Amino acid sequence: MKNDYQIVTYNKTNYYVFRYVKTQESEKLFVIDEDDFDIIMSTGLSFYGIHSYIGHNITINDEQYTAYLHDYIVRDGDISSLVHHINHNTHDNRKVNLISVPKDEFELYQPKYHRTIELPKKCGINENQIPKFVHYVSKTKKHSDKFVFKMNIIGKDKPLIYQSSESKDISTFDKYVQIVEIILKLNNQYPEYFINKGIIENYSDNSLQLMKEYNEIISLTSYDCVKKNIMDIPKKFKLESLMSKASIKVQQYLETVDLTKKTGKNIKSNLPKGCGVTLDMIPKHCYYRPANEKTGDSFRIDRKHPLIVNGKELSTTSKKKVSTKDKFDELIKLLETLDNKH
């Protein structure tokens, strides 16, 4: 059965609105530009919803393939890329809503998947506002809960991975504040990694405008199913600093430390006053361990440091007769030695 269609004029531009039957009780609409009308007609086949997109199955040399409408319009045979719908509506196939992106970048452009997250009750965090690529890790026997941000970067061997403190002395909300600050800092440092990825903003202004246009275009038809095809336009959410809502302890920590260069272990400084070392000097994946009754203080290289291959922490000397500053200098030399081995 061929698709039926109507032509409408919106903002002095013509569009074709096609209809197909999804089920006996459900009809769906999709939109294309006027100059792409011949693409559909030249196939001699009908288009319909398939794998969440608009397309149809074709047979070539007794093999069945799925051909998508957006590929006819944008890709033109380019197999190294995929087509992304900017407003996340795969039934809106206007060229203004389609961009071709490399295959290995495609997932970065997709909306945040709905996740069921078991956050602690009354922790003060709205689950729906947790940014894309942020995961909540529940407490275990080895550590308290924490938030982890992990995003693959095209052209880089390793993803961006940062985490909040996992200290049991820090509230879940304060840990969330930390991960938000990390993301905002990374966005300032590497804006090219975040643009159009739905991290800082859940939807761009352009995406929301394209949603609105789609609704207005299909509303110009006389189809009875228009109301059931109207997109729900989401409320825009922009990630903003929550520092002012954090505990005083965490506020003071965040004001003096760059979390993109820290692991978050030492939220409160236990460094001896006047020792010549401050929190912001301690490299990422390293931390200070205060003295106890048996041993002096020391600096540690966390087992999660990328230069650690055996999964074991490394430590400077903890001899009480060695100054804290000398132990810090030893830490830096340890890191240099590890780096030279790689």
UniProtKB/Swiss-Prot annotation:
It comes from the Viruses. This is Uncharacterized protein R424. It comes from Acanthamoeba polyphaga mimivirus (APMV).
